[in-house]
Amino acid sequence: MELKGKKVLVAGLGVSGIALCKVLDSLKAKVIAYDEKEYDVLKENLEEIKSLSIDFRFGKFKKEFLEGVDLVVLSPGVPTDSDIVKTAQEKKIELLGEVEFAYRFSKAPIYAITGTNGKTTTTSLLGEMFKNTGRKVYVAGNIGYPLIYAVMEAAEGDFIVAEISSFQLETIKEFKPKISCIINITPDHLDRHKTFENYRDIKGRIFENQREDEYTVLNYDDPVTWSLKNKAKCRVFPFSRKSLLENGAYIKDGSIYISVNGNAEKIIDIEEIYIPGEHNLENALAASSVAYLSGISADVIANTLKTFKGVEHRIEFVDEINGVKFYNDSKGTNPDASIKAIQALKTPIVLIAGGYDKGSEFDEFVKAFNGKVKKLILIGQTAKKIRDTARKYSYPEDDILFAGTLEEAVKKAYESAKEGDSVLLSPACASWDMFRNFEERGRIFKKAVAELRR
């Protein structure tokens, strides 16, 4: 893609947008960087690119921003029904999403993971499996390292393992992974995608350009994910925690097996997998399937599963103070993710929840408390909504507390906990009402826990 001298507008100046600006500048494009937020809000983000030859635009979108523009590249956070997208379409300006743009530069094969929950763990785990073969691998995408950096650095013999979100899949055109995987699909981001059916179909786009000789790995146990198999033109490889499969990854006699064309091979005993929880077994099956289909040996897969310690902000053990354990699950940004965190812990729980309202319902989340959640500390925009749902299911009013900050929530949680309890931050909501992202929320939680020792 020749971009020298072309006028390119990057819409959205988060992590991906900043990366796009840097790469486009290095390709000698004339870059316009635009965000609807004002400069003061973005000042910190812009430090990296303020010395480059970039023309900045901030605030409410104006049609003249697109004057003479050859290409618009969208960051994932920019909705496809925004004014900038509509105007670019009216003016017939080429419009590419960040992932689609990056894909067009890729020399290395991309192994793409999506799903509502477990994406980051599965992507990181698969990345470790590739790394343990001794080959050069880049772990990128929605996981924090922008895909555009990975494709620019990766050579032909390297591998790219990418976590891909629904926001990123919404704008693909030719994007075609070597192997794709959908871990699960439960309601999320309905504020953006409007209906669950639309969200499901966007997730299914991950394999829409794959050919007959390529694979998509799908969760056999999740009816919504498995229903997408009929849309696939490529081969479908299932994984299951509950059923024995003639062809696929499955559990038999307490061990993971993978069978390809009827030839089954034992991978590992479940008790040897380092990361705990049923949801992590699902992640292990998904990552192992992609790795095995990529030609990685059962030994390498097993050794990785024995040593991989999980990811930051996902049921991450933080500390134990006076017999009370603290877990950071800031990555629990929807009810289903937080249900899995509650199920993974075996002790009584003091739960810190609440945050930005994405339009989620909290009925199943509250039902999962099931005698395990002894106190509920609520923060953020959804605090009252979760409280009202808890009341509906007769959760004791006296066991619900409110906190104005996360630091206050941590103090209240510690005061409410006894020896043998766990304090779990698993908000079931996004972080954007109080924090820049879930990582910042998780770091503030860990800092607040450390303060308890002072």
Swiss-Prot record:
Its EC number is 6.3.2.9. Disulfide bonds: none annotated. GO terms for cellular component: cytoplasm. GO terms for biological process: cell division; cell wall organization; peptidoglycan biosynthetic process; regulation of cell shape. Pathway: Cell wall biogenesis; peptidoglycan biosynthesis. Pfam families: Mur_ligase_C, Mur_ligase_M, MurD-like_N. It comes from the Bacteria. ATP binds at residues 115-121. Keywords: ATP-binding, Cell cycle, Cell division, Cell shape, Cell wall biogenesis/degradation, Cytoplasm, Ligase, Nucleotide-binding, Peptidoglycan synthesis. It is an enzyme of class 6 (ligase). It catalyses: UDP-N-acetyl-alpha-D-muramoyl-L-alanine + D-glutamate + ATP = UDP-N-acetyl-alpha-D-muramoyl-L-alanyl-D-glutamate + ADP + phosphate + H(+). HAMAP family: MurD. Cell wall formation. Catalyzes the addition of glutamate to the nucleotide precursor UDP-N-acetylmuramoyl-L-alanine (UMA). This is UDP-N-acetylmuramoylalanine--D-glutamate ligase. It comes from Thermoanaerobacter pseudethanolicus (strain ATCC 33223 / 39E) (Clostridium thermohydrosulfuricum). The gene is murD.
